[in-house]
Amino acid sequence: MAAPSNVFWDPAGHLHTNALHWEGFPRLLWESLRSFLYTEPPQYDAVEYQDEGVRRCRVRMTIPQHPFRSQWQPIEVDVVGHRIVDTIEGAALEAIYLFCNQHPREVVGQPIGLFSTTDPNDPEWNLRVVPEGHRLEDST
């Protein structure tokens, strides 16, 4: 059972939520964390603002310290977007990537482990991507 959703605005105009009231990456992240025995869902702090006339949104999200695995430190994500809902989704997806990178052995065999943990700046990753380009070049 999912933790109850908590959504509220503070006096400074920040939205605080665990984002469990809709389907998407926040719920997938929480369901995955629960399978690793986390007891508290990630918390999202979102604020909208104007930047040179462009509507922006900043979301700070924290996966709390694991309740009994002290070596699993909290994960903090800071994402900037344009709308609160989309930026919360982006923050949750970024947290999934970070969690998978920090705990590669633990996520093997878990649905969350299907998310890529690669770095496009890594030469080995580039070797996997570049050879596919020959298919387009040879089709002329």
Residue spans for each PLM region:
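N-terminal segment of the canonical double-stranded RNA-binding domain
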Residues: M1-Q71, H82-V85, E89, L93-T140
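Contiguous, small/hydrophobic- and glycine-enriched helical/loop subdomains that border
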Residues: P74
